[in-house]
Amino acid sequence: MTREFIYLPTFESKWKKLGLTDDDAIRLENELLSNPLIGKIIEGTGGIRKMRFAIKGKGKSGSTRVIYIDFQVHKEIFFLDVYQKSDKEDLSQHEKSQLKKLVEFLEEQL
């Protein structure tokens, strides 16, 4: 299975602020290559998924959440958001609405 991974600038910024590295990004990409549908679909977002991503030494339950969309037809995964579970559990309705608009925009561009 192949995918192109696209990191939005806001994602990259948050990724670095969380102390995650390029090696962590490679681990994330490998997880998604083995199963792009690993994340649970977030209702009302146009197909966006949320997955747990373990930070070494913390385990999955206390680590980060990665928000992404997999455009299967185009074989592209866009990384949209990342945050620690301790910072917030779920996306707000406003965030979901904004991400849905982003997905619609990305679909038009592909």
Give residue ranges: language-model regions.
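N-terminal targeting/export leaders
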Residues: 5-8, 25-33, 39-45
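Basic/aromatic recognition patch in beta-strand/loop cores that engages polyanionic ligands
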Residues: 39-82, 87
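Enriched for short, Lys/Arg-rich terminal
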Residues: 70-110
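Arg/Lys-rich, positively charged N-terminal/basic patches that mediate binding to nucleic acids
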Residues: 1-24
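Sequence/structural signature of beta-propeller domains
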Residues: 1, 22, 26-27, 34, ...
